[in-house]
Amino acid sequence: SEMCIRDSAHAFVGRAAYDWASELTIYLDHNAKKCGLGRKLYEALADRLKDMGVLNLYACIGYPKVEDEYLNKNSAQFHEHLGFRLCGTFENCGYKFNRWYDMIWMEKIIGEHTLDQAAVKPYSYSE
């Protein structure tokens, strides 16, 4: 059977002042959950971003007031387990499956903020 896995990291906001912040996203096939793969992907992304000089990591997460058959609180719990903390809630921000969901932002600081911050290094692919 095939398994679908996708991960990405991109600039948090498209302005130079936010170059040191990155939003992370991973999507795992249902069969790939609860086996440590998500943690490994996030840790690899965070390590690469830290090497580039990124300081702040963010995750935008759909969050139900009450869990239902479409959305649970697992993603928020996963991020908290990885050291992210809740830094913002947008009430009833997302609408899908004929219902409203909150959107939460979670943050993890992975580097030291200085007054003379070095520029973020561009991404370079290497195997």
Region annotations inferred by a language model:
Residues 49-74:
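Conserved GNAT acetyl-CoA-binding A-motif
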Residues 9-11, 28, 106:
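GNAT/GCN5-related N-acetyltransferase fold signature
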Residues 8, 60-62, 76, 80-99, ...:
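Conserved catalytic-core motifs of GNAT/GCN5-like acyltransferases
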Residues 25-33, 61-65:
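A short, internal acetyl-CoA/4′-phosphopantetheine-binding micro-motif in the GNAT/acyltransferase core
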Residues 34-51, 72-77, 81:
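Conserved acetyl-CoA-binding loop-helix of GNAT-fold acetyltransferases
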Residues 8-18:
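A conserved beta-strand-loop-helix scaffold within acyl/acetyltransferase catalytic domains
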Residues 20-22, 92-127:
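C-terminal "cap" of GNAT-fold acetyltransferases
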Residues 2-5:
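Short, small-residue-biased leader/transition segments that mark boundaries at the very start
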